[in-house]
Amino acid sequence: MSDYIVVKCGGSMLNQLNDVFFDCIKKLQQKYKVVIVHGGGPEIDAKLKDCNINVEKRDGLRITPKEVMDVVQMVLCGSTNKKLVMNLQKHNLLAVGCSGCDGNLLQVQPVSEEIGYVGEVSYVETALLKGLINMGYIPVIAPIGVNGNEIYNINADNAAAGIAATLGAKELIFITDVDGILHEGNLVKETDESEIATFIETGVITGGMIPKVQAALASLKMGVQKISIVNGTKDFTEVTGECIGTTVTKGVSIA
Protein backbone atom coordinates (compact mmCIF):
# COMPACT_ATOMS: atom_id res chain seq x y z
CA MET A 1 0.00 0.00 0.00
CA SER A 2 1.41 3.41 -0.96
CA ASP A 3 1.62 6.61 1.02
CA TYR A 4 -0.68 8.55 -1.31
CA ILE A 5 -3.99 10.06 -0.20
CA VAL A 6 -6.51 11.39 -2.72
CA VAL A 7 -9.02 13.97 -1.46
CA LYS A 8 -12.16 14.55 -3.52
CA CYS A 9 -13.99 17.81 -2.82
CA GLY A 10 -17.34 18.30 -4.53
CA GLY A 11 -18.26 21.61 -6.09
CA SER A 12 -21.03 22.22 -3.55
CA MET A 13 -18.45 22.02 -0.74
CA LEU A 14 -15.90 24.46 -2.16
CA ASN A 15 -17.59 27.55 -0.73
CA GLN A 16 -18.04 25.87 2.67
CA LEU A 17 -14.38 25.04 3.29
CA ASN A 18 -13.06 26.71 6.43
CA ASP A 19 -9.79 26.86 8.39
CA VAL A 20 -10.53 23.43 9.87
CA PHE A 21 -10.44 21.79 6.43
CA PHE A 22 -7.09 23.31 5.54
CA ASP A 23 -5.67 22.33 8.94
CA CYS A 24 -6.75 18.75 8.20
CA ILE A 25 -4.97 18.85 4.84
CA LYS A 26 -1.83 20.05 6.64
CA LYS A 27 -2.04 17.10 9.04
CA LEU A 28 -2.53 14.65 6.19
CA GLN A 29 0.41 16.15 4.32
CA GLN A 30 2.69 15.56 7.29
CA LYS A 31 2.23 11.80 6.81
CA TYR A 32 1.15 11.30 3.22
CA LYS A 33 1.49 12.55 -0.35
CA VAL A 34 -1.76 14.41 -1.00
CA VAL A 35 -3.63 14.91 -4.28
CA ILE A 36 -6.87 16.94 -4.41
CA VAL A 37 -9.58 16.50 -7.06
CA HIS A 38 -12.46 18.99 -7.16
CA GLY A 39 -15.84 19.30 -8.81
CA GLY A 40 -17.70 22.45 -9.77
CA GLY A 41 -21.33 21.61 -10.49
CA PRO A 42 -23.02 24.65 -8.93
CA GLU A 43 -20.65 27.12 -10.62
CA ILE A 44 -21.09 25.36 -13.96
CA ASP A 45 -24.89 25.46 -13.61
CA ALA A 46 -24.78 29.18 -12.77
CA LYS A 47 -22.54 30.00 -15.73
CA LEU A 48 -24.70 27.95 -18.12
CA LYS A 49 -27.74 29.87 -16.89
CA ASP A 50 -25.90 33.15 -17.53
CA CYS A 51 -25.24 31.91 -21.08
CA ASN A 52 -28.89 30.85 -21.54
CA ILE A 53 -27.86 27.21 -21.99
CA ASN A 54 -30.11 24.52 -20.53
CA VAL A 55 -28.73 22.28 -17.77
CA GLU A 56 -29.48 18.63 -18.56
CA LYS A 57 -28.36 15.50 -16.73
CA ARG A 58 -28.89 11.79 -17.30
CA ASP A 59 -28.14 9.16 -14.65
CA GLY A 60 -26.18 11.75 -12.70
CA LEU A 61 -23.99 12.71 -15.67
CA ARG A 62 -24.11 16.14 -17.26
CA ILE A 63 -25.20 16.06 -20.92
CA THR A 64 -22.29 17.88 -22.51
CA PRO A 65 -22.55 19.02 -26.13
CA LYS A 66 -19.76 21.25 -27.47
CA GLU A 67 -21.22 24.55 -26.20
CA VAL A 68 -21.63 23.08 -22.69
CA MET A 69 -18.12 21.59 -22.78
CA ASP A 70 -16.68 25.04 -23.45
CA VAL A 71 -18.38 26.40 -20.32
CA VAL A 72 -17.41 23.34 -18.23
CA GLN A 73 -13.78 23.76 -19.22
CA MET A 74 -13.82 27.50 -18.52
CA VAL A 75 -15.28 27.06 -15.03
CA LEU A 76 -13.42 23.95 -13.87
CA CYS A 77 -9.99 24.84 -15.25
CA GLY A 78 -10.37 28.54 -14.55
CA SER A 79 -12.15 30.14 -11.61
CA THR A 80 -12.97 27.00 -9.60
CA ASN A 81 -9.50 25.48 -9.78
CA LYS A 82 -7.67 28.72 -9.08
CA LYS A 83 -9.90 29.68 -6.14
CA LEU A 84 -9.08 26.39 -4.43
CA VAL A 85 -5.37 26.75 -5.20
CA MET A 86 -5.35 30.27 -3.74
CA ASN A 87 -7.25 29.13 -0.65
CA LEU A 88 -4.70 26.39 -0.05
CA GLN A 89 -1.81 28.81 -0.47
CA LYS A 90 -3.49 31.32 1.83
CA HIS A 91 -3.15 28.58 4.45
CA ASN A 92 0.53 28.03 3.61
CA LEU A 93 -0.10 24.91 1.53
CA LEU A 94 1.79 25.17 -1.76
CA ALA A 95 -0.45 23.96 -4.57
CA VAL A 96 -0.39 23.70 -8.35
CA GLY A 97 -3.67 23.66 -10.24
CA CYS A 98 -3.98 21.66 -13.42
CA SER A 99 -6.58 19.76 -15.37
CA GLY A 100 -6.62 16.27 -16.74
CA CYS A 101 -5.70 17.56 -20.19
CA ASP A 102 -2.40 19.01 -18.95
CA GLY A 103 0.37 16.59 -19.88
CA ASN A 104 -2.37 14.11 -20.90
CA LEU A 105 -2.84 13.50 -17.18
CA LEU A 106 -6.31 11.95 -17.51
CA GLN A 107 -7.11 9.99 -20.65
CA VAL A 108 -10.72 8.91 -21.10
CA GLN A 109 -13.09 6.69 -23.00
CA PRO A 110 -16.29 8.47 -24.13
CA VAL A 111 -19.35 7.25 -22.22
CA SER A 112 -21.83 7.51 -25.10
CA GLU A 113 -22.60 9.77 -28.04
CA GLU A 114 -25.99 10.56 -26.49
CA ILE A 115 -24.50 12.58 -23.64
CA GLY A 116 -21.78 14.29 -25.66
CA TYR A 117 -18.32 15.09 -24.37
CA VAL A 118 -18.41 12.98 -21.21
CA GLY A 119 -15.69 10.45 -20.52
CA GLU A 120 -14.58 7.92 -17.94
CA VAL A 121 -10.96 7.63 -16.88
CA SER A 122 -9.08 4.95 -18.81
CA TYR A 123 -5.47 5.96 -18.06
CA VAL A 124 -3.69 8.24 -15.58
CA GLU A 125 -0.26 9.69 -16.34
CA THR A 126 1.08 9.61 -12.79
CA ALA A 127 4.53 11.02 -13.60
CA LEU A 128 3.15 14.57 -13.55
CA LEU A 129 1.49 14.09 -10.16
CA LYS A 130 4.55 12.43 -8.64
CA GLY A 131 6.82 15.14 -10.01
CA LEU A 132 4.74 17.94 -8.48
CA ILE A 133 4.53 16.15 -5.15
CA ASN A 134 8.27 15.49 -5.09
CA MET A 135 8.81 19.23 -5.56
CA GLY A 136 6.63 19.93 -2.51
CA TYR A 137 3.37 20.87 -4.20
CA ILE A 138 -0.17 19.59 -3.74
CA PRO A 139 -1.65 18.84 -7.18
CA VAL A 140 -5.17 20.26 -7.47
CA ILE A 141 -6.91 18.54 -10.36
CA ALA A 142 -9.88 19.76 -12.41
CA PRO A 143 -11.79 16.75 -13.81
CA ILE A 144 -11.27 17.32 -17.52
CA GLY A 145 -9.76 14.58 -19.69
CA VAL A 146 -8.60 13.91 -23.22
CA ASN A 147 -9.39 11.40 -25.93
CA GLY A 148 -7.40 11.98 -29.11
CA ASN A 149 -7.55 15.71 -29.76
CA GLU A 150 -10.84 16.24 -27.93
CA ILE A 151 -11.45 17.42 -24.37
CA TYR A 152 -14.05 15.64 -22.22
CA ASN A 153 -15.88 16.33 -18.99
CA ILE A 154 -15.31 13.70 -16.27
CA ASN A 155 -17.48 13.11 -13.24
CA ALA A 156 -15.24 14.27 -10.38
CA ASP A 157 -15.87 11.09 -8.38
CA ASN A 158 -14.70 9.00 -11.34
CA ALA A 159 -11.63 11.19 -11.81
CA ALA A 160 -10.69 10.89 -8.13
CA ALA A 161 -11.24 7.13 -8.14
CA GLY A 162 -9.15 6.69 -11.27
CA ILE A 163 -6.28 8.70 -9.82
CA ALA A 164 -6.47 6.90 -6.46
CA ALA A 165 -6.56 3.46 -8.08
CA THR A 166 -3.62 4.18 -10.40
CA LEU A 167 -1.50 5.62 -7.59
CA GLY A 168 -2.40 2.66 -5.38
CA ALA A 169 -3.52 5.23 -2.83
CA LYS A 170 -3.81 4.30 0.82
CA GLU A 171 -7.15 6.06 0.93
CA LEU A 172 -9.67 8.08 -1.06
CA ILE A 173 -11.44 10.68 1.06
CA PHE A 174 -14.81 12.12 -0.01
CA ILE A 175 -15.36 15.56 1.53
CA THR A 176 -19.06 16.15 2.31
CA ASP A 177 -21.18 18.35 4.58
CA VAL A 178 -22.27 15.44 6.82
CA ASP A 179 -20.33 13.33 9.32
CA GLY A 180 -20.67 10.17 7.22
CA ILE A 181 -23.35 7.49 6.99
CA LEU A 182 -25.76 7.71 9.92
CA HIS A 183 -27.85 4.78 11.22
CA GLU A 184 -30.55 5.73 13.76
CA GLY A 185 -28.66 8.94 14.42
CA ASN A 186 -25.35 7.23 15.09
CA LEU A 187 -22.28 7.37 12.87
CA VAL A 188 -21.57 4.14 11.00
CA LYS A 189 -17.79 3.95 11.40
CA GLU A 190 -17.20 0.98 9.08
CA THR A 191 -19.27 -0.63 6.36
CA ASP A 192 -18.92 -2.64 3.16
CA GLU A 193 -20.61 -3.22 -0.19
CA SER A 194 -23.31 -5.65 0.95
CA GLU A 195 -24.23 -3.58 3.99
CA ILE A 196 -24.51 -0.43 1.89
CA ALA A 197 -26.95 -2.22 -0.45
CA THR A 198 -29.04 -3.14 2.60
CA PHE A 199 -28.88 0.42 3.94
CA ILE A 200 -30.20 1.78 0.63
CA GLU A 201 -33.00 -0.82 0.45
CA THR A 202 -34.12 -0.11 4.02
CA GLY A 203 -33.93 3.67 3.71
CA VAL A 204 -30.99 4.18 6.08
CA ILE A 205 -29.14 5.83 3.20
CA THR A 206 -31.28 8.33 1.28
CA GLY A 207 -31.08 11.45 -0.83
CA GLY A 208 -27.71 12.99 -1.50
CA MET A 209 -25.82 10.27 0.38
CA ILE A 210 -26.79 7.63 -2.21
CA PRO A 211 -24.58 8.99 -5.03
CA LYS A 212 -21.73 9.42 -2.54
CA VAL A 213 -21.78 5.78 -1.45
CA GLN A 214 -22.26 4.63 -5.04
CA ALA A 215 -19.12 6.56 -5.94
CA ALA A 216 -17.35 4.89 -3.02
CA LEU A 217 -18.38 1.44 -4.25
CA ALA A 218 -17.28 2.27 -7.79
CA SER A 219 -13.92 3.36 -6.38
CA LEU A 220 -13.48 0.02 -4.62
CA LYS A 221 -14.15 -1.78 -7.90
CA MET A 222 -11.45 0.33 -9.56
CA GLY A 223 -8.95 -0.95 -7.02
CA VAL A 224 -9.01 1.63 -4.22
CA GLN A 225 -8.65 -0.27 -0.94
CA LYS A 226 -10.25 2.16 1.50
CA ILE A 227 -12.78 4.97 1.17
CA SER A 228 -13.66 7.53 3.84
CA ILE A 229 -16.74 9.75 3.80
CA VAL A 230 -16.12 12.70 6.12
CA ASN A 231 -17.47 16.11 7.08
CA GLY A 232 -15.20 18.75 5.58
CA THR A 233 -16.50 21.47 7.90
CA LYS A 234 -15.21 19.63 11.00
CA ASP A 235 -11.86 18.23 12.05
CA PHE A 236 -11.94 14.88 10.25
CA THR A 237 -8.44 13.80 11.30
CA GLU A 238 -7.38 12.39 14.62
CA VAL A 239 -4.06 13.27 16.22
CA THR A 240 -2.59 10.36 14.26
CA GLY A 241 -3.85 11.78 10.98
CA GLU A 242 -6.39 8.98 10.49
CA CYS A 243 -9.82 9.96 9.18
CA ILE A 244 -12.92 10.28 11.34
CA GLY A 245 -16.09 9.45 9.41
CA THR A 246 -17.46 6.39 7.65
CA THR A 247 -14.91 3.97 6.23
CA VAL A 248 -16.04 1.84 3.29
CA THR A 249 -14.05 -1.27 2.37
CA LYS A 250 -14.71 -4.40 0.35
CA GLY A 251 -15.06 -6.84 3.20
CA VAL A 252 -15.82 -5.15 6.50
CA SER A 253 -19.14 -5.40 8.28
CA ILE A 254 -20.39 -3.93 11.52
CA ALA A 255 -20.11 -6.22 14.53
Curated annotation (Swiss-Prot):
Gene Ontology CC annotation, any one: cytoplasm
Record's keyword annotation contains ATP-binding: yes
Binding of substrate, residues: G40, G41, R62, N153
Keywords linked to the UniProt accession: Amino-acid biosynthesis, Arginine biosynthesis, ATP-binding, Cytoplasm, Kinase, Nucleotide-binding, Transferase
Cited InterPro entries: AceGlu_kinase-like_sf, AcgluKinase_fam, ArgB, Asp/Glu/Uridylate_kinase
Any one Pfam family match given in the protein's UniProt record, by short name: AA_kinase
Top-level lineage group: Bacteria
Residues the UniProt record annotates as site (Transition state stabilizer): K8, K212
EC number assigned by the record: 2.7.2.8
Cellular localization per UniProt: Cytoplasm
Pathway assignment: Amino-acid biosynthesis; L-arginine biosynthesis; N(2)-acetyl-L-ornithine from L-glutamate: step 2/4
Catalytic activity: N-acetyl-L-glutamate + ATP = N-acetyl-L-glutamyl 5-phosphate + ADP
A single MF term (Gene Ontology): ATP binding
Gene Ontology biological process terms in this record: arginine biosynthetic process via ornithine; L-arginine biosynthetic process
Family: Belongs to the acetylglutamate kinase family. ArgB subfamily.
Protein name: Acetylglutamate kinase
